[in-house]
């Protein structure tokens, strides 16, 4: 069964999901800031998701909104603008049937080797974790939505941990959960 998908934040992850779903026959729209080539079968739009006139070019009531943008800067203001304000505006303007919000394990305060699982409290002391948690709550305020807390993505161009390990600079006796970008 085919469905409609809108991707806000069609960077590496968003573009991969968009391409996969388009190849499956779904109707896919993808928005990103930079004017770069997009795989075939995707209705590509370049622009700033913070601008109402850009959002209005996307379909209303899509089956799924995949919300996976990146802030312009690593500041509390930009995180709030990108994850909370833009998500709220997208929810109001696009009225999708379901939202998948790509969050992060930054929502957890445990960062000194503690074991973290789905029962761990999401009470980060860092601004990025607090803002992401606020955005998760906004997303989850509507039934059927989901927040995905990705802990780290590996794959082409994402070699920092591998490079550190090869140089002997990696952390020893440390657990980490990673996901390959193809998955």
Predicted regions and their residues:
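N-terminal Rossmann-fold NAD(P) dinucleotide-binding loop
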Residues: 14-15
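NAD(P)-cofactor binding segment of oxidoreductase domains
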Residues: 62-100, 134
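Glycine-rich Rossmann-fold phosphate-binding loop(s) that bind the pyrophosphate
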Residues: 10-11, 150
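Conserved N-terminal Rossmann-fold NAD(P)-binding element of oxidoreductases
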Residues: 5-9
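Conserved beta-loop-beta element that borders a ligand/cofactor-binding pocket
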Residues: 104, 134-157
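Conserved Rossmann-fold cofactor-binding substructure of NAD(P)-dependent oxidoreductases
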Residues: 43-63
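Substrate-positioning beta->alpha
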Residues: 150, 160-163, 169-183
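Conserved Rossmann-fold NAD(P)-dependent oxidoreductase catalytic core, especially the SDR/UDP-sugar
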Residues: 88-125
